[in-house]
């Protein structure tokens, strides 16, 4: 490649990236996933589009996609709270294993029938599109206030279901490439355990070593993110090299670092946020360039049947069967999880495997995977907000600071500065600072008024429009935000949680005459907390609901995992 070609490559690449970024606001206006915008830009720049760029280098696309996916999973892991595993780990693992196997089987049967394939070829198609995509799930769920059980299950599933899909894809390719090969059940079981076992061991072990290395190193602030990124990629590559799941490993590395007091954590997250956007843009641009839309015309009708068969039948059946042991999931939760079986980059990456193995019909597998991904993003991704509202799994928005940044005084400092803009409807307007009930371990460090810095004292009175810089830790964030942040619209909370709020220590006997409850010997001595535990189990989350004696009971308050109050919706309002 000469200098002119290199400059042309830089010019075209930068232009496509800039166009993708500038078009990103269109996604929110049209209600479509931003990843679809990036993919569309790549397709339009490709062979059949106005750009006319001929790109058919599957090896390069495979390299770019794997690198991008690793970075996205590292960032996603660092932003996942390990506390969410309390309610979502086992359901997510069930979906990531049994769910993928069931989806693969049903989709494989449909593919074999629709495209007149051998049943093994049909199963290969099912395995390729059988797993949800972490990049798509993290991107579309980011910033949404979903029921914790549902949101965490979807995120953990998407970060851990790739080993099963890779295992099934590689095994089926080996069988199809050599029909005489003897692949025993024990061999396949060992391969499966190796994928998961090595992925978990190297992810957690490597994450611990990387965490120690980061905290013991004294580097310039900008170098910590590079150390984490390079270390994560080394663990990802080592896991793949040894036969484990690199995708699972790097997700666990991020999870470990994000939930430990890590030096430079806030600057690492800021850098990874930018890197994740670059990765998403680069990955979907390259995959879009790889597609020749005219090739999809021959398969569009059976392709639609396959995509909708998977969305409306295979995925829901897999979810319902996988979650049968977990009674805490309501029917609405299950339907929403079924609908958010988003396909993205992973199926396209897996579809490259048969191409690189030289299997007959590999181009069909690739085109089918791409078609399913397009339909999934366009149909499921675009309707996610509506689905969350209909399933009642999206919680009212919480008050939050307008910005927050780390104060990394110590190597593992957890202090942050939260910035709040006071609105007129806050009760603290006109009150002196000394009368505020601030959470323990927090302090107002600065007050800005009309672009002027004030020196706050106990007698300083707050005014509407003031900007407060508050020093504290994440454990105090909710209390501080309730005190200073712009609250959600007052109608939203009652509409979701109910019009009446009851402390969980109240006895049902005291509520019986008010709400017309009919109690027996078993319920006569119960408190509201006992009722919630009996109906929802030991790990309820905010927004959980159940119907009891014609009333809708909604978990409206939690403190360290314990339900503190419950909202009640009357039958006419439910």
From Swiss-Prot:
Keyword Transmembrane helix: yes
A biological process term (GO) from this entry: cell volume homeostasis
GO MF assignments: flavin adenine dinucleotide binding; potassium:proton antiporter activity
Alphabetized UniProt keyword annotations: Antiport, Cell inner membrane, Cell membrane, Ion transport, Membrane, Potassium, Potassium transport, Transmembrane, Transmembrane helix, Transport
Pfam families assigned: CorC_HlyC, Na_H_Exchanger, TrkA_C
InterPro entries: Cation/H_exchanger_TM, FAD-bd_PCMH-like_sf, Na+/solute_symporter_sf, NhaP2, RCK_C, RCK_C_sf, Transptr-assoc_dom
Annotated localization: Cell inner membrane
Function per UniProt: K(+)/H(+) antiporter that extrudes potassium in exchange for external protons and maintains the internal concentration of potassium under toxic levels.
Protein name: K(+)/H(+) antiporter NhaP2
Source organism (scientific name): Shewanella sp. (strain ANA-3)
